[in-house]
Amino acid sequence: MVNFSNKLTKDQIPGWEEYYFNYKMLKGRVNEYTEQTKEGTQYRRRVLKDFSKLLDDEIEKIVLFMIEQQGLIAARLEDLGKRRARLQDIPLLQEITELREDYRSVGLDLVTLLKFVELNANAVRKILKKFDERLGYKFTDYYVRSRSNHPYSQLQQVFRHVGIGAVVGALSRNLSDLEERQGSYLNIYDQHPLAIPKDPIIDLITATADKLTNSTNFLRFLGQHALIAQADSTAGTEDEQHVGEDEYHLMSLVLNLANTFLYMVNTYIVVPTADGYATSLGAAATACGAVIGSMAVAQVFSSVYFSAWSNRSYFRPLLFSSVVLLLGNVMYAMAFDLGSLTILLLGRVLCGMGSARAVNRRYISDCVPPRIRMQASAAFVSASALGMACGPALAGLLQTNFSLYGLTINQITLPGWIMAFGWLVYLIWLWILFQEPDLGPDVKDFYEGSSSSTSTRYMEQEKMEQGFTEHLLPSEQDEEDDNGDEEHNETLSSSTTTLRPASSVASAYTLLTPSVKVQLLIYFMLKYAMEILLAESSVVTGYYFGWDIGTVSVFLAVLGLSVLPVNAIVGTYISNMFEDRQILVASEMALLAGVMLSFKLTVEYTAAQYVCSAVLTFVSAEVVEGVNLSLLSRVMSARLSRGTYNGGLLSTEAGTVARVVADGTITAAGLLAGEGRLLNATLLPALLVCVASIAATLSTYNSLFY
């Protein structure tokens, strides 16, 4: 493994050596501080002051040189602009070609500058981590808090590359103007950004800048929801891409996305009618929590065995999932004529046992080529969101009542029959068109924990992921590089062990940093609040406002349809204006406000108050989920990006447990407090969990800096 000091020296740009971060000197100073503190000859406050000054001086050196280089690039652009102006009246093809190449040369120099900043940013991050490890201080937390939020922050100059966007804009506009217009008189500012033809050098600059700052867009923002390992757009060889294309089967991917969509429809199609079904079988309306939540209870266990099963096959778990869901929905529909609440609950449990979302996620991660993996991840999230919206909407359309061969077909049983038919069609489609990918013995050994496998494929994936997982604070890759500072003769087998996925719940738990634990708590909180809102909506609106099934269905469908627009706004605009941690805290506060506004504190409780508070709660929860998973996908250990106990499974389990607890809360509150006090009784725990998650977020706020 390469020593980072040597790597830093090797990758330096000739002529710029004196402007790089002096990692070797600072590392030596850390070693001195370590010895002095052991001997008692150095005080903590003095160490912090001295090291802070050294860091400030090094970062200032980098920033001033970066600004100087930006000025030189701007001056070159100004000169090129004058040359372009002279060609306006008498355009000469040879001159235009030369001018275009000169603009591209400026673009390459900008890429070089960005790589200079990236290498220095890595050095800053690593020396901060090394200081904390050696001396046991929380210096990183102090330094980030005091420097990153200061109005004259030079640290932000390094990590946010202020001013680069203006240079990219100038390059894009001038290169676009120099292209053959073929009769078009549109300026780039008159076109949508996605419609502007981009020169390859602009794509290279954008990819390099994105790698440095983790800048996001809607597609990447959606894709990160799935917690699926993505490839670095600037990494990977042509051979790697070619192998991925050979293994890729479009229809199999579509079948996985269809499974995700149908399962989410299956989950939420019963929400508007669950209370009516419970009362028709002699139970209380609040037993809807048990009806809805029984599916989530089973999903807690099914997610684990499906994730493990997908180590060996994708077709068989999908086949099993379809059969189980078909039988579960038939049982759900027949419970009405059998007059059995037990059959109803068993049917929902059986549906939960068919949750194959872990398989769907793993298929995208392992069998979709890096070139389109982000699009596939975004499609996975979109399929879930659309299923969530279509479920209640479909329930609102099933307003009928007749008998067929002795079976009652009405608005209560039709969701079960419709979903059973849907899973039957899907089962046939799956049997005919799904193509089982060849995982190969190495991949199976890697996931199953065999020490004989070198797992080359996944070591290459690890290299590709490094571009999106480099942050200011400690990461799994930091640990590997720091080990390289101390040991230069690590074997291939030890490297493979470092990359090996977690083999048990206990080993997965040891990989969770405090920040990751807090983010899983946040995920629990938002799913708890959303489930309380959705699951009790039919009972609350029926009790206070007299809403029928159709009205509740429309209300829930509108909430579900808000998911994609909200993510589009956050992913395209807001996340590029603010840091993720800032958006996270603000949206958590908004969620808390939504929960507080939902309480019935006066004699009269209006539909306007309920709808406004519900929309605020739901939309805020969606923003929290998107930003939280975006952060989680970057700070979680690389070893949790694959294997049975992966990051996606952990987040799914956290969310599923939250739904189980929320549905149990609704049922218990209904039995103990009755429908009249159900709303406040269920909102109080949601309020407490929300406050706890905000406090936990603030306690780890500085560790979310990148």
Swiss-Prot record:
Biased segments, Acidic residues type: 476-488
InterPro entries assigned to the protein according to its UniProt record, in alphabetical order: MFS (IPR011701), MFS_dom (IPR020846), MFS_Domain-Containing_Protein (IPR051068), MFS_trans_sf (IPR036259), SPX_dom (IPR004331), SPXM_SPX_plant (IPR045264)
Membrane topology type: Multi-pass membrane protein
Transmembrane segments annotated in the record for this chain: 251-271, 281-301, 318-338, 340-359, 378-398, 414-434, 520-540, 554-574, 583-603, 611-631, 678-698
Name the record gives this protein: SPX domain-containing membrane protein Os09g0521800
Species in which this protein is naturally found: Oryza sativa subsp. japonica
GO CC annotation: membrane
Keywords: Membrane, Transmembrane, Transmembrane helix
GO MF annotations, alphabetized: transmembrane transporter activity
Keyword check for Membrane: yes
Assigned protein family: Belongs to the major facilitator superfamily.
Region (Disordered): 475-498
Domain spans labelled SPX: 2-145
Superkingdom classification of source: Eukaryota
Signal sequence range: none
Pfam family, one: MFS_1
PANTHER family per the UniProt record, alphabetical: INNER MEMBRANE TRANSPORT PROTEIN YAJR, SPX DOMAIN-CONTAINING MEMBRANE PROTEIN OS09G0521800
Localization per Swiss-Prot or TrEMBL: Membrane
UniProt main location, coarse: membrane
